[in-house]
Each structure stands twice: as C-alpha cells, then as structure tokens.
Amino acid sequence: MNEVVQSPAIQPLPKSAPTAGKQNLLDLDRAGLEKFFVEVLGEKKFRAHQVMKWIHHRYVTDFDEMTDLGKVLRAKLQAHAEVLVPNIVFDKPSADGTHKWLLAMGVDGKNAIETVYIPDKTRGTLCVSSQVGCGLNCTFCSTATQGFNRNLTTAEIIGQVWVAARHLGNVPHQMRRLTNVVMMGMGEPLMNFDNVVRAMSVMRDDLGYGLANKRVTLSTSGLVPQIDRLSAESDVSLAVSLHAPNDALRETLVPLNKKYPIAELMASCARYLRANKRRESVTFEYTLMKGINDKPEHARELARLMRQFDNAVQAKDSGKVNLIPFNPFPGTRYERSEEAHIRAFQKILLDSNVLTMVRRTRGDDIDAACGQLKGQVMDRTRRQAEFNKTLQAGKGSDAAA
C-alpha cells in the first residue's frame, strides 16, 4: 500500500457555489437519493442507484457524461440537481507516502479543512474531518487552538472521500486503495451527528465506497448521549479519545470530561458493545505527553481501567489501547514522551494483558500527524463565539449541551 498511483494534478472544479433551488446529490445517502428521484424527478429508484455509482465509483459530476441515462432524465437532473465537491486549495505529499489535502468549504475562502490519506502495507486509511475547527478545547490538540466555526454538511464530509478516492484511482470492489476511513480529522463528529451518520452510510454502501462496517471508525472525545444514539442508528467501529486514566488529569486535557466523567464514558462504551454482538472492541486513544500522563503509575491505572471495562462488557479484550506519541505544533507547552518511556508504558499494559499498540507517527513533515490538523481558519475569538451560539441554539441532537 505504500505505492500511490500518480495521477494528473486535480484542478478545482469550475463551479463551487450552490445553485438556488438545486439539490446537491452529495448531500444524500441511498435512501435520500431514492426519495429525491421518486418524489422530485418522478423516476424509478434504480435510476438513483445508477447516478450514485456514477458519482462515487466513476467520480463523474457532469450529468451529460452519465451515458447510460436517457436525455430526458439528464435534462431533469440539470434542472433540479447538481454535484458539488470541495475545491482543492492544495494537495501535499509527505516523504513517507502520507498525503494531505486542504479543501475549501464554501465560496468565501474563510473556511477550509484538512483531509489526510495514510498508506500502509496492507491498507490505506483516510482521516476525515467533520467540522471546521473544534470547540472542545482539548489542550494538546492543534485544531482546538483555532476554535469552532461550523459543522460540515454531508456533502462536505463525503466530498473528502470523493476527492481522495478520485486522486488514488480507487475503484470499489476492483482496485481498492482506500480501505479504511477514520472520523479523526478536525472536529468532534458526534457534535455533527446527522451529517456524519449520513456520510458514513455512503462510505459503507455498495453503491458508495463499499467499506465494511468495521473499516469505518468514529472517534469521539466522549459525548455520552450521542454514543448511545450512535449505537442505535449506525454500526461502525468506535474509538474514544481518553488520554488520561483518571478524572482529575483528564479534565485538564479534555475539558468535556467535566460534563461526562470517565465512569459515565466507559459505561456508554460498554453499552455500545453489548448492543451488537458483531462489535468486538472499543479503541481507547491515549496521547503520551512528557511528564504529564506517561508515568508508570498512569500506565498501571489505565490497565485497571481496561480490566474494569472487560468486566463490564463481560468479554476479554473489549478495550484496546492505541498509544500516540504527542505531535508538537507551534505554541504548545507539551512535549513528546521519550521513546524509552513510551515502550515502558506499553510494557506495563502488555504485562497486564491489555491489547496495546503504539501508533507510528506519519505525515508530521507536512503537519498531517495526529493532533496537527487545523486548516485555514478565522480568528479564534470569532470561531469560539460561533461555537457558543451553536450550543445555545441546541441544534437538536447535534449539540453537545
């Protein structure tokens, strides 16, 4: 998977502004597209399936190029619909094969997000963003330094997959270079619940990108009610940004812990696994920072927490730990743990029979490593005001408050 097929540089599509009265088909999953074709276009459902394959399998956005559609249907589509994908500001390869795209969201140039493709020997993983910025203020994350602006639409989320898959020459079921998607980019996915779940549906649909449920992973900082809702409405792998083994420390790193402490978070994760026997484990992400959370006593405390989690689920290896060496960014006060401390931390966990791996740092030469994403954004004060407005408005079940 390390070899990425070189394709011609992808130019931004000439049209990026939505047209009033037209439906962006990237905003729709299979059910939504079928409904649009039946109720708006007066067509059969199978026509929606044809168009979905043109968009997500062949990366065609011009209805006139969808050659197995009749002229009448193409005319209807031209009148009522469009396919708008994110504009590419730049794409940047890393020496290790990692690739980062900066994608413009909207037409004002003020909102941009980053998407990262990470190739490995047996798989290719795309790290996808769910928000422009983030308002959770995790103190060790670069994205948090920019504050929050807005949620991404379904089209803007799945559009990241479209851009990357097109660049890679990915053909579902034939030439698969994109094997996994992780919702671990900019933003808290569960604060944009509906759009994220709809986008993940397209990722897992055979008419979309055909990924198995377990190959789509949602990472959350720990919004307990939304984890329970996710369990009922979707079926993907769950990862939790833990980063500390106790509430006192986690509250300094992940302020959301004050609202949803570790005991509540772990209980919701146990419910998530128990609700579906096909769900085998939850991954707990733990970023190691020098002198902060990398001491032997932290490792022993984390091991106890994982044993308690196994007992709650009543299954061995229900919790897996992913140790992440901290990736520095300008202005941070944190430092990466020394390699010897990382290995010693891992050994304590392994000796306690906790499945543990250390994530290799990839893409740090292009600021694409874990915790380094932040895009081109507005000033923090304005963005935080937008986040507070979102919380106050409630935004249904998509808000954290």
UniProtKB/Swiss-Prot annotation:
GO molecular function: 4 iron, 4 sulfur cluster binding; metal ion binding; rRNA (adenine(2503)-C2-)-methyltransferase activity; rRNA binding; tRNA (adenine(37)-C2)-methyltransferase activity; tRNA binding
Cofactor details (free text): Binds 1 [4Fe-4S] cluster. The cluster is coordinated with 3 cysteines and an exchangeable S-adenosyl-L-methionine.
Gene3D superfamilies from the UniProt entry: 1.10.150.530, Aldolase class I
Source domain of life: Bacteria
Record keywords, A-Z: 4Fe-4S, Cytoplasm, Disulfide bond, Iron, Iron-sulfur, Metal-binding, Methyltransferase, rRNA processing, S-adenosyl-L-methionine, Transferase, tRNA processing
UniProt-annotated catalytic positions: 114 (proton acceptor), 370 (s-methylcysteine intermediate)
Function as written in the Swiss-Prot or TrEMBL entry: Specifically methylates position 2 of adenine 2503 in 23S rRNA and position 2 of adenine 37 in tRNAs. m2A2503 modification seems to play a crucial role in the proofreading step occurring at the peptidyl transferase center and thus would serve to optimize ribosomal fidelity.
GO biological process: rRNA base methylation; tRNA methylation
Annotated protein name in UniProt: Dual-specificity RNA methyltransferase RlmN
Binding positions (S-adenosyl-L-methionine): 187-188, 219, 241-243, 327
Broad class of enzyme this protein falls into: transferase
Localization in the cell: Cytoplasm
Chemical reaction(s) catalysed: adenosine(2503) in 23S rRNA + 2 reduced [2Fe-2S]-[ferredoxin] + 2 S-adenosyl-L-methionine = 2-methyladenosine(2503) in 23S rRNA + 5'-deoxyadenosine + L-methionine + 2 oxidized [2Fe-2S]-[ferredoxin] + S-adenosyl-L-homocysteine; adenosine(37) in tRNA + 2 reduced [2Fe-2S]-[ferredoxin] + 2 S-adenosyl-L-methionine = 2-methyladenosine(37) in tRNA + 5'-deoxyadenosine + L-methionine + 2 oxidized [2Fe-2S]-[ferredoxin] + S-adenosyl-L-homocysteine
Annotated S-S bridges: 127-370
TM segment ranges: none
Major place of residence: cytoplasm
Keyword DNA-binding included in the entry's annotation: no
One matching Pfam family: Radical_SAM
